[in-house]
Amino acid sequence: TKLYYRTTAAAGTCSTSLPDGPPAAQPFCWQPYTSSVASSQIVTTTTDAGVTVPLIVKVERGTMNRGIYDIAVLVSDPTGPWTALAPQAGWNRKVYYTFGASTGQPRRQARPATNWSTQEAQLRRGYLVVQNSMTDSARNSNRVMMSETVMMMKEHIADTYGPIQYTLGTGCSGGSINSNMNASIAPGLLDGIITSCTYPDSETTTMEVADCTLLVAAYHKMRTTPLCRDVSQA
């Protein structure tokens, strides 16, 4: 578990890449926090619960159900305790779960496709943001295992951080499939979903794409075309 603070650098002048990743062309928007960092260097935010605090987040990285996960949450007291029975005031008790896009079954561990450092808007409002590579569609196409991983992550959050008011799921393309499939496989696991570039599932989407390819080929190579070449259209 590490602490990071949001610098006062304006958007577009700093990199939203993970601060513990490879060097970026611009300075990182998020920097490691220590008690020696001056408050003037840290952005201040007000959560949707009306709590105003410096924008400092606690980031937990671990493994769950074979996937690598990241959890980031706003802290109101960087050096103070946090228990499930006494969560810090920076968290609004809401969870924002991001599902990664694409589709695949590589059968290997990898870090989540979505970086917590890009979800500043949610962190500013007090949401706990979470990702797990086993809930990224590019890393795992077993939808039952994916839903099981979401359940295990929620259990870990409740045990470690405190009771959850509600959980929002979000994602694009394969991420939208996982959001929708959660609602089908385990109703109630997600209290709401916000999807973009949405598909219902991988099976019906694949059939539609395959049909389109075959039909386009057929229309361009119809055997009846020569018979109709000199026929006037009605």
Predicted regions and their residues:
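Alpha/beta-hydrolase active-site loop
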Residues: 141-161
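Short glycine-enriched nucleophile-adjacent loop
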Residues: 176-187
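A catalytic-pocket lid/entrance helix-loop region that shapes and gates access to the active site
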Residues: 190-234
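Short, surface-exposed "cap/lid" segments of acyl-processing enzymes
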Residues: 70-118
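Catalytic-loop region of hydrolases
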Residues: 1-91
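Alpha/beta-hydrolase fold nucleophile elbow
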Residues: 162-173
